Every structure is written in structure tokens, then in C-alpha cells.
Amino acid sequence: MKIVLLGPPGAGKGTQAKSISNRYSIPHISTGDIFRKNISENTPLGMEARSYMDKGLLVPDEVTINMVKDRLQEDDCLSGYLLDGFPRTVAQAEALNEFLENRNEQLDTALLIDVPSEFILDRMTGRRVCTSCGGSFHIKFNPPTIDGKCNLCGSDIVQRKDDTVETVKERIDVYDKQTQPLIEFYKSKNLLSMVDGTKAIDQVFEDICKLLGEQ
């Protein structure tokens, strides 16, 4: 089973990806992991990527695509895989499509965990983390017993810079601009599946399994 996982920041993609990977015995392939591995091992592609990153430039699509292609040809991908963070653009989606066609393979589905922007904003801006032990809380869904204090060690809990309203809104805007064309691309190929990401984690996974059972 070959799956592309889509969804906005804060949609719970990481949690669901882990569950899908375990249930279907396929590797969860994250673009971030691929980059880190290539860079730490000083592969030719890793060194090329680093040369752009060191200058504060975006890594060209071609480099990212080639890294992903290399990863998808490893032995653990023979029975399928779950791609998380790739493709991000229609150009990358077309490159993946071409790669699969050349191998007489095809994508089973592009799975979108759909969560409205207001819900994402509520979910992410409410997150708090302990300054000492790293314990995590949510002011609405998992509040501390004493306001502003960690249940585990009593230290202050704070909002991370990544979770401020301004930052979250910016991330949602970037996601919308990048991903909407991608959603339309997979829709046009009848490959898009969608689940409601506002439900409880277990229910979202159950819905995903039902969808994948129909592929």
C-alpha cells in the first residue's frame, strides 16, 4: 500500500502516521528524516542540500525529489510506504507520479486529514510546555491543576514561540497556498481520500482504516 499523507499543521499527522505504519507494516517516510539522514551521512545529495541551506536558500525540488526517489527504492519499501511531507507541490506530485509509472506502480491514495483553520488555531495556540521537565498541557483539553504550573514538577508552563496566534496563522496560510493545488491534483486523479481530523484520535484512525480497506 502506497499512501501520501496530507493535512495542516496540528492535524495530528504524526500520530496517525505512526498508527498506519504499525497497522499495515509499511515504513513512515518523513521528508525531514530523509534530509537529516542524507546530511548527516554526507551523501552527494545531502551535501548539495546543505549548500543551499547554509546560504538560507530553499532546497530545489530536484534535490528533494531525488532524495525521496532513493529512499523509495530501499528494501523496506517493497510492500509500500506512507509519505509524510512529500509531495508539497504539484511539481513534486508529478515527479512522484512519473517515478511510479516508470516502475509500473501506482499510488493507492492521497489521504487528507481535514481540519478547519479555526480548530487548528484553537488546538495549537492552547498548547503549553513545562520549562523544567518538558511536560505538555493544553489550556482547554488538558489543563494543569494549578493555572500556569506543571502538575509533574510545579515549574512554570509556557507557550512556545511556534504556538503563538501570529505564527500559527502564518503556518496555516503557507499550508493553504501550498496544498490546495495538491488537493485538486489528487482529486483530478480520483486518488483523494478525506477524513474528519476534528474527531478523537482513535476515531480518526478508525475512519482511516475504513477508507484504506476500500482501496
Swiss-Prot record:
Q: Where do the segments described as NMP lie?
A: 30-59
Top enzyme class, one word, equals transferase
- Main localization of the protein? cytoplasm
Compartments, as annotated in UniProt:
Cytoplasm
Q: In which pathway does it act?
A: Purine metabolism; AMP biosynthesis via salvage pathway; AMP from ADP: step 1/1
Q: Which key words tag this protein in UniProt?
A: ATP-binding, Cytoplasm, Kinase, Metal-binding, Nucleotide biosynthesis, Nucleotide-binding, Transferase, Zinc
**PROSITE patterns per UniProt:** ADENYLATE_KINASE (PS00113)
Record-annotated residues binding ATP?
Answer: G10, A11, G12, K13, G14, T15, R127, S136, F137, K199
Q: Which CDD domains match?
A: ADK
Region annotation (LID) ranges: 126-163
Q: Where does Zn(2+) bind?
A: C130, C133, C150, C153
Question: What EC numbers are recorded for this enzyme?
Answer: 2.7.4.3
**Which molecular function term from Gene Ontology is one that the record holds?**
zinc ion binding
Q: Name one Pfam family in it.
A: ADK_lid
Respond yes or no to whether keyword Cytoplasm is given for this record.
Answer: yes
Positions contributing to AMP binding: T31, R36, L57, L58, V59, G85, F86, P87, R88, Q92, R160, R171
**Does the record bear Transferase in its keywords?**
yes
Q: Which reaction does it catalyse?
A: AMP + ATP = 2 ADP
**Subunit record text:** Monomer.
Q: What job does this protein perform?
A: Catalyzes the reversible transfer of the terminal phosphate group between ATP and AMP. Plays an important role in cellular energy homeostasis and in adenine nucleotide metabolism.
What is the UniProt domain comment for this protein? Consists of three domains, a large central CORE domain and two small peripheral domains, NMPbind and LID, which undergo movements during catalysis. The LID domain closes over the site of phosphoryl transfer upon ATP binding. Assembling and dissambling the active center during each catalytic cycle provides an effective means to prevent ATP hydrolysis. Some bacteria have evolved a zinc-coordinating structure that stabilizes the LID domain.
Instruction: From the Swiss-Prot or TrEMBL record, give the protein name.
Output: Adenylate kinase
Q: Which organism is it from?
A: Clostridium botulinum (strain Alaska E43 / Type E3)
